Design a protein with these regions (language model features):
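Conserved C-terminal structural/oligomerization subdomain of aldehyde/semialdehyde dehydrogenase
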Residues: 1-99
């Protein structure tokens, strides 16, 4: 089952590749968190984690950014442009010219 709540899991890893493998070894993917003294490394790892959102070094939630999960954590997005688009229907009208 997917856990909804703050959970801190500490698992030892050998190297960056192993850490990413462990993080992605789940059928769920709602949110993740990366902490590192090396900001470029943290960003590189964050790009490879398969979750709908990854926070780096304590970043707060940005309500202008889309929020939603990967894998069994659902589809669709809330917030941001992607969240608004979930409620819109696109329509194309061809041949509409002024008389």
């Amino acid at each position: 089952e997917e856990i909804f709540g703050p959970v801190l899991v500490i698992i030892p890893y050998k190297d960056e590749e192993d850490a990413i493998r462990i993080a992605n070894d789940s059928q769920y993917g709602l949110s993740g968190f990366v902490v590192s003294k090396d900001l470029e490394r943290a960003r590189r790892v964050a790009r490879r984690i398969r979750t709908g959102q990854v926070r780096v070094n304590g970043a707060k939630h940005d309500f202008s950014a889309p929020f939603g999960g990967y894998k069994y954590s659902g589809n669709g997005r809330e917030f941001g442009v992607f969240g608004i688009e979930e409620y819109l229907e696109a329509k194309s009208i061809c041949g509409y010219f002024p008389a």
